[in-house]
Amino acid sequence: LGAAFEGSSDDAELDRVEATYAPLAEAVRDLIDATIQTRADEEGILQARAVIEAVTQSLRREQSRPCEVSYRGDARPIPLANAVIGQCNPIAPPVVVHHDPDAADGRCWAEFVLGAAYEGPPGLVHGGVCALVLDHLLGEAASQGRTQPLFTGTITVKYLRGTPLGPLRCEAWVDRTEGVKAFARGFLSDAEGVTAQAEGVFIKPAWAREVP
C-alpha cells in the first residue's frame, strides 16, 4: 500500500487504490472474525495456517513504509490506514463519518457494526474500543471534518452501561472553542439508547497556529 499510495491528491488514483486495497482489507476483517469464531479441528487449523502464512509471505515481498495521508479535491485528508476510518486497514471496522454541513457546532455521526474482533467482556465491546471510536468522532467534529489540525489533549469517557457487539451509532459536536482549543462532546449508542458519553479538549499544535 505504501508504494502504491504516497501522498496522492489525484482523485482517480485514490479511487484506484481504494478499489485495489479496500477489498483486501475487508477480506482480512472477515478472516479475523472467522479466526475468532471457528471451531475447526486441528487438521483444518493447520491447513488454514499454512495458507495464511503463504499469503502473508507473498504480500511481504512488496512492501514499503506506511502510506502517507492524501487528499481529494475538497482538500479533506483521506487516511486509508487509520485505525478507525481506514478503508485499507483491516483493524478498522471501518467507520464512515457523516458531517452536517448546516450545523454550526460541527456535528457529525457514524453508524457501524462492531463484531467479535472488538469484544471485551463476553458479548460487549471492549471499553478501549468505545473510547477509540469516541475519540475519533470528537476529533472529527473539533477539526471540522479533518480540515483543521487539532489533536487530542484530554478525553474523558463515562460508561453508562455495557456496549453490546453489533450495530452502533456514534455522534459528536463542538460545545465551545477557546483560542487554540476546541471542546467537544459526544456519545455512543445502540438500539436501546446511549451506552457511553465523552467530552474532550482538542488543541491546535504550535506549528499550525499561524495557519488561518
What are these regions (language model features)?
Residues L1-P66, R72-A75, T163-P164, D175-P212:
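HotDog/MaoC-like acyl-thioester-processing domains
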Residues H98-D100, L160, W173-T177:
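Short beta-strand micro-motifs enriched in acidic
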Residues E43-E119:
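Long amphipathic N-terminal alpha/beta scaffold segment
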Residues D105-R107, V125-Q148:
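Active-site helix/loop of acyl-thioester processing domains in fatty-acid/polyketide metabolism
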Residues D100-G106, G162-P164, E192:
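A short, structured loop/turn motif at beta-sheet edges
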